[in-house]
């Protein structure tokens, strides 16, 4: 399954859609900044909330929790490294490798690819493509990708951008 997020600048108070391979709106995402952290709500095509990405407030480093259908399934954890950022998806056992700032990375589970993220050129403009491997939960994969991006951009105190250069 391939999902696409159109390139533009988002903030946590913005709304945007995630399209499928046919250009149809498959998911809707709405960001909110509340007094106790940032939240990103993910809705299905019938506007039912199916996932939530929320900032973990009490933490030394930016952390985001992923909930799917009201159940916490993952926490994005930044590994301590000196050179390039590395992430681990706690709760799912997923490892994340690649160039996060260019949105060109892969999420793996036990050496098998779960989802790859890269820039793609499609008819509706510059987008980032999420290629979700068969047998994987696309909602969880989408929420984890959005959470990784939220962690990246929360580390930059001067930036309120969401999903980088999108």
Cite the ranges covered by each PLM segment.
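Intrinsically disordered, low-complexity proline/glycine-rich segments
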Residues: 1-166
């Amino acid at each position: 399954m391939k999902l696409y997020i159109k390139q533009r600048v988002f903030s946590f108070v913005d709304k945007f859609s995630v399209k499928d391979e046919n250009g149809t709106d498959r998911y809707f995402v709405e960001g909110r900044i509340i007094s106790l952290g940032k939240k990103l709500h993910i809705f299905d095509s019938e506007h039912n909330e199916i996932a939530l990405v929320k900032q973990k407030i009490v933490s030394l480093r930016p952390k985001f929790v992923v909930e799917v259908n009201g159940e916490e399934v993952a926490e994005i954890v930044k590994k301590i490294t000196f050179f390039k950022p590395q992430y681990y998806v706690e709760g799912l056992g997923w490892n994340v490798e690649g160039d996060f700032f260019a949105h060109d990375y892969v999420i793996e589970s036990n050496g098998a690819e779960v989802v790859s993220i890269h820039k793609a050129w499609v008819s509706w403009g510059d987008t980032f493509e999420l290629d979700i491997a068969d047998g994987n939960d696309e909602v969880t994969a989408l929420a984890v990708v959005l959470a990784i991006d939220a962690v990246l951009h929360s580390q930059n105190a001067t930036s309120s951008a969401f999903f980088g250069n999108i």
